[in-house]
């Protein structure tokens, strides 16, 4: 019985970016996020309760090798949060990213309509910063719409989930 539980709790069956290799429409993240994109999202705690909502304005500039992405989040409690990403394309399927509140480098993987972004973010909580690991997926729906789902963990335990809809101008 213990072996069964350990096997079923492992991450071997987790969704992988390569699972979307031959699917359409293809999400080329530097193309989709270039220009203006509007977003709306909800943050849920580990129990699934919606704790915050936001709208966001994104503006990206692609120079042929690197995407500079400016994000401005307007939270429903009045907080305004900004972030600037520098996302570098390594090859057709691999990316690296940095931002002021990201620990080290983010790793990105692009296949078909899916883009997976893995990173550790410094999140302000009660006057201090916590390191939260993000497993961030974006799925392109058509030329204008993409859906984002991010799972946030601390010490391997889920602490929150984020659901976002993007609409490109």
Listing of model-derived features with the role each one plays in the protein:
Residues 124-128, 136-139:
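Exposed beta-sheet edge/beta-hairpin loop segments within beta-rich domains
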Residues 1-49, 61, 169:
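Amphipathic/hydrophobic helical signal segments and adjacent flexible N-terminal regions
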Residues 40, 44-125:
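Central antiparallel beta-sheet cores of small beta-barrel/beta-sandwich binding domains
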Residues 50-56, 129-134, 158-162:
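Amphipathic hydrophobic-ligand
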Residues 135-136, 140-169:
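Glycine-rich, aromatic-bearing surface loops/beta-hairpins
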Residues 21-25, 55-56, 101-105, 133-135:
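Short structured motifs
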């Amino acid at each position: 019985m213990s072996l069964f539980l350990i096997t079923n709790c492992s991450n071997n069956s987790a969704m992988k970016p390569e699972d979307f290799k031959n699917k359409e429409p293809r999400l080329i993240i530097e193309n989709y996020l270039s220009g203006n994109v509007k977003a709306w999202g909800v943050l849920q705690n580990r129990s699934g309760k919606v704790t915050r909502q936001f709208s966001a304005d994104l503006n990206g500039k692609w120079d042929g090798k690197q995407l500079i992405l400016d994000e401005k989040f307007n939270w429903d409690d009045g907080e305004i949060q900004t972030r600037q990403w520098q996302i570098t394309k390594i090859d057709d399927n691999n990316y690296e990213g940095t931002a002021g509140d990201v620990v080290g480098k983010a790793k990105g993987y692009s296949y078909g309509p899916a883009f997976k972004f893995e990173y550790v973010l410094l999140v302000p909580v009660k006057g201090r910063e916590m390191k939260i690991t993000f497993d961030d997926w974006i799925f392109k729906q058509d030329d204008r719409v993409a859906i984002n789902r991010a799972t946030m963990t601390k010490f391997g335990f889920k602490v929150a989930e984020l659901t976002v809809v993007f609409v490109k101008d």
